[in-house]
Design a protein with these regions (language model features):
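A generic "folded-domain core" signal
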Residues: 22-206
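Bacterial N-terminal signal peptides that target proteins for export
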Residues: 1-9
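Hydrophobic h-region of N-terminal signal peptides that target proteins for export
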Residues: 12-21
């Protein structure tokens, strides 16, 4: 089950990194909820960094497991792609401070891809994006976010991969977190029911 989930997440994140077919379906204050036509099982709710807008902190929900929140961290780096690729499938230790509280999570790095420009977006320097996910925080983490106003996310200085991060820390607003999470739950439940109906239809058509 773990392997199947991980494989699905990798496929999904490849789509996310390409910013393909993304549909921002809900926004409240600093948080938004995004769905993907190419992989409708996943719902992402997240916010952007205050130091680097391209840094993203949030969670993934998957249809069929709506009570689970899979942490999602996106980080950019100008370190050479080959060096960053060596970090794939490795865990990176993050220090997280929602207001005065402290948590420490070792989150797997599943995907590293270059951020490519387009006719609408020019990227002058080589920029790579790293995705960290497939980690489900302890149950006390979400209540701390609900009660907080901001969260700082930092790569632990003793982590061997710390050198791969140009900017190893950032702050994220928690304004809008509660509403975004609730909307993500609702979307997840709707999609779960749709999948059940689809699967039942497949069975009856056999």
């Amino acid at each position: 089950m773990q392997f199947i989930f991980k494989t699905s997440v990798v496929i999904f994140l490849c789509v996310v990194l390409g910013y393909l077919h993304a549909d921002e379906v809900f926004t409240h204050k600093d948080w938004s909820v995004t769905t993907y036509d190419s992989d409708p099982e996943f719902i992402k709710y997240s916010t952007h960094g205050s130091a680097v807008w391209g840094h993203e902190f949030g969670f993934l929900k998957r249809a069929g497991s709506c009570d689970e929140d899979n942490i999602y961290v996106s980080w950019s780096s100008t370190v050479k792609l080959d060096q960053l690729k060596e970090m794939e499938d490795q865990k990176v230790l993050f220090d997280l401070h929602p207001d005065e509280q402290f948590f420490q999570f070792a989150v797997p790095n599943l995907v590293v891809n270059p951020l490519l420009g387009s006719e609408y977006l020019e990227i002058p320097n080589s920029l790579n994006v790293m995705l960290f996910t497939n980690y489900f925080p302890q149950v006390t983490f979400s209540p701390s976010l609900e009660a907080g106003r901001r969260i700082s996310v930092k790569v632990n200085e003793k982590d061997p991969h710390h050198r791969n991060f140009d900017i190893p820390d950032d702050e994220f607003s928690l304004e809008g977190y509660i509403a975004a999470r609730q909307f993500a739950v609702e979307q997840c439940e709707i999609r779960t029911q749709a999948l059940k109906i689809k699967n039942q239809y497949k069975i009856t058509m056999r």
